[in-house]
Design a protein with these regions (language model features):
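Short, well-ordered coil/turn elements that cap or connect secondary structure elements
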Residues: 9-11, 39, 140, 175-177, ...
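Mg2+-dependent phosphoryl-transfer enzymes with acidic/Ser/Thr/Gly-rich catalytic loops
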Residues: 156-158, 162-240
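Short glycine-/acidic-enriched loop or helix-start segments at secondary-structure transitions
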Residues: 25-27, 56, 117, 192-193, ...
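Conserved acidic, metal-coordinating active-site core of Asp-based
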Residues: 90-181, 192
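Active-site phosphate-binding/coordination module
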Residues: 2-94
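Short, solvent-exposed loop/turn segments at secondary-structure junctions
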Residues: 22-23, 51, 112-114, 151-152, ...
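A short acidic, often aromatic-flanked loop/helix-cap motif at beta-alpha or helix-coil junctions
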Residues: 50-54, 152-154, 210-214
């Protein structure tokens, strides 16, 4: 997937928006990219777009919409109450359940270090997290509460979500949202990708990394095809 991402960056501007924090981006995105190439075409938006990083010789933070101390206390208290009220208690967890990411507080039902195989089978229909989210919506009416990934619930400041990140992309890069194509796995109501679709950005829903790989391969093929000169397209093929 990293080689595909590199290929895509060489053709078109690319932005990665995820619920993960900057250290995860460094490990899972930046460190995996093949060496060489121009990183100026890559924008990274951790914690659901509440942070923005761009490359200019080094990775630089453009903004970070951080919580105040009192907001953090309110959100953490609400999480503990909602989790208890929903009666959700996994048999085994891997690492901390709640992580303060500065501009986002994230609940990971099986823990931050849970194996992917365990995460994907824990709540495939989102039913467990919906119970918790419904309680959080009542407790945190002044915040954005979204489900993401396989086991997570993300809380950000009101209106500071992935759609906010898209608006920042349009203003910073000078690219209209009508020129964008978004790929995500939580485009349903309540998912952390849903605000992007609501903002009017053309979106493609994917199920898993392999599904995402196929979509990216198709995008690259279509973009490359559009760059071929008409006379080159009409050249006959040698079938010998």
């Amino acid at each position: 997937m990293s080689s595909l991402l590199r290929e895509l960056i060489d053709i078109v501007n690319v932005a990665v928006i995820s619920g993960g924090d900057w250290p995860q981006f460094e490990k899972q995105v930046i460190a995996q990219l093949p060496p060489g190439g121009n990183l100026a075409g890559l924008s990274l938006l951790p914690t659901c777009g509440t942070k923005f990083f761009r490359y200019s010789g080094q990775w630089t933070k453009i903004y970070s919409e951080d919580f105040t101390t009192s907001e953090k206390h309110q959100i953490l208290s609400a999480f503990h109450e909602a989790i208890s009220g929903a009666g959700i208690k996994p048999e085994k967890v891997w690492g901390d359940l709640i992580e303060d990411r500065g501009s986002q507080i994230t609940y990971s039902a099986l823990g931050q270090q849970a194996p992917l195989a365990e995460k994907v089978k824990w709540d495939p229909d989102y039913a467990k997290r919906k119970k918790i989210k419904n309680l959080l919506d009542a407790l945190l009416s002044g915040f954005s509460v979204r489900m993401g990934g396989a086991t997570s619930i993300d809380v950000t400041k009101p209106g500071i979500d992935k759609a906010y990140g898209i608006r920042k992309l349009t203003s910073i890069l000078g690219i209209s949202s009508k020129q964008m194509l978004y790929v995500g796995d939580a485009l349903f109501p309540g998912g952390n990708d849903y605000p992007v679709e609501q903002a009017g950005v053309a979106s493609i829903a994917v199920r898993d990394p392999e599904d995402t790989r196929r979509v990216v391969q198709t995008i690259i093929a279509c973009l490359c095809d559009s760059l071929v000169e008409p006379q080159e397209k009409s050249l006959p093929r040698d079938h010998s």
